[in-house]
């Protein structure tokens, strides 16, 4: 049965793909694959038959998912933002992925707020981020907007490498992300000016990276993906380019950040015990500790102890402690062990024994932790995990392959992806019972219908409440959305026939329809979780804001560039006037004095007018040129000014 279902789904998929191609034929250009991570993001492209992971402007292949706003009003994204976290913690935003698609009341949001250095406020039952964007201006951003800024950075990284505009992308999400989180991620893409052609699950993308070139018959692959903020386990069968997800499980709130947090809390307590001082009051000190703890954690993957040294940590005092691997493991042992539960669950759901697993693929930076590797190995009775792929880049690699498929690249071969919905979907029926329509681990895309009726006589309206989760009662599950079907003709209870249809698309996003079979009256809802989801108007406003930000960034850069040009020119002249071997030795004392005075004047003006606008900087440079050039022309006759002044200075970027 299962095989024929798969074959049918395959035919359906290939059929729809072809039909879509016939319909579309639009040129989507180069489609990029983006791994939008909690702590780091990565972008890849399928080019000339292979995947290229693209380095950012700092030369790094992964980019911190950080956005910062400086007091001068500059917006920094990526490495530059992360590097100034300790000096500007209140306005440096990270971990947006832990807030995206969640409600304000979500216990995990409430837990996170305690440890985030920036302000998180409630707006329309959602967590919004409040920062000072410079010039004493406060602004609130939805988590989608912060994620959009990171996506924009990845888009620009790809554009710089490709030398052309990028408009279409495949973006990855944790397999265990629910409907609201997937929709919100798609919205973030829209705000960043990207058409997100497909949302794919991270472990599935990693499996593509692992199995793209494996052609030796059917294999069972277990992907264990533990990143900075989320954890997924997926079990797939790979068979000559067909990747079928059999089961998936995980925790969308478990990762390296939680391990860091445990260590930080340990040291904060220790410091209080030793000095009586509570560091938590000082945001900067806590962020300095965060930075050093993360460094120490990485070091402990290859050594048994690491020193944590922080100069002027708190109230001028230094911090110096040792963290051993054993202590790190002890502080996190319950979290490490909890990663085995989803592994067990996935095996149960797919009716497989441990010995049936052919390969274990470790993905995500946190799988470098020796204890995690040891626990996985012990769970699988000593079986060594596969070491063939880069845990940081595998997800973006797989996304880039899928992007290649969607852009019609012939070199990707016959790649077919069959993914599943991670959670059971259903509706509430009398007594608050969860009536399941689509069980978890059903292959998507899928469509299921069921007939329901009214609960009381002459009931004119039925309210359809859509839930996801595994518990028998809806109160224990997650409400996705609600809608009404009205205009039901008066009839005794149980007589009207109401057909409810659930349809999940390839992105794992759900659409629900209800139809009164008697009247043909229909109502539908794309589950966009109205309280949770941005409205089209909000998205449009955010798109405009994002464009405005890009414009402001450009203006700011232009202002800095013109300021630097004036500064370089002035200092270049100052150095030449002072050099007796060069210009200084050739000028008459009168001309020298005129030039020195003009140069000093401009340097002083610069020091007191850091915030002047572009026109002012240009005007001051012109004034200086008008004084200097006649003197230099006189000196050199008609040979023109010496080449080492303005032209050379203007060509050099100041550091």
UniProtKB/Swiss-Prot annotation:
Residues 421-501 are annotated as: Substrate-binding (SBD). Its EC number is 3.6.4.10. The keyword Chaperone applies. Its main location: endoplasmic reticulum. The modification Phosphoserine is found at residue 87. CDD domains: ASKHA_NBD_HSP70_BiP (cd10241). The modification Phosphothreonine is found at residues 519, 644. It comes from the Eukaryota. The modification N6,N6,N6-trimethyllysine is found at residue 586. The modification Omega-N-methylarginine is found at residue 493. One of its GO terms (molecular function) is misfolded protein binding. Belongs to the heat shock protein 70 family. The interdomain linker regulates the chaperone activity by mediating the formation of homooligomers. Homooligomers are formed by engagement of the interdomain linker of one HSPA5/BiP molecule as a typical substrate of an adjacent HSPA5/BiP molecule. HSPA5/BiP oligomerization inactivates participating HSPA5/BiP protomers. HSPA5/BiP oligomers probably act as reservoirs to store HSPA5/BiP molecules when they are not needed by the cell. When the levels of unfolded proteins rise, cells can rapidly break up these oligomers to make active monomers. This is Endoplasmic reticulum chaperone BiP. It comes from Bos taurus. The lineage of its organism: Eukaryota, Metazoa, Chordata, Craniata, Vertebrata.
